[in-house]
């Protein structure tokens, strides 16, 4: 378990050292706040050289407000996954992630 206080799970944690020590090269990421924690961890992991799978249907987020505009969670989620896919990660379904781990 890695306790974190930052959006990026690699920032100010031992995560990178733990992964290196274990010889891990591929990460499967999912979680809450697709547009924040999942995105930050995905970008950082990719920048550090990891192969990253983001399990899109195992992530979620919330509506975002900016002034008088509310962006629905589904749009935030889809836009974030589209940004990450094929640039920082491969976005997959739960079934695809499980098959990749076999």
Language-model-detected regions and their locations in the chain:
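Active-site-adjacent betaalpha module
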Residues: 1-102
């Amino acid at each position: 378990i890695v306790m974190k206080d930052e959006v990026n799970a690699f920032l100010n944690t031992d995560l990178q050292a733990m992964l290196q020590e274990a010889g891990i090269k591929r990460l499967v990421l999912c979680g809450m706040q697709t547009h924040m924690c999942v995105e930050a961890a995905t970008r950082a992991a990719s920048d550090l050289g990891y192969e990253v799978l983001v399990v899109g249907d195992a992530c979620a987020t919330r509506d975002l407000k900016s002034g008088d505009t509310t962006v629905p969670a589904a749009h935030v989620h889809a836009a974030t996954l589209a940004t990450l896919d094929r640039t920082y990660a491969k976005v997959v379904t739960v079934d695809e992630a499980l098959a990749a781990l076999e």
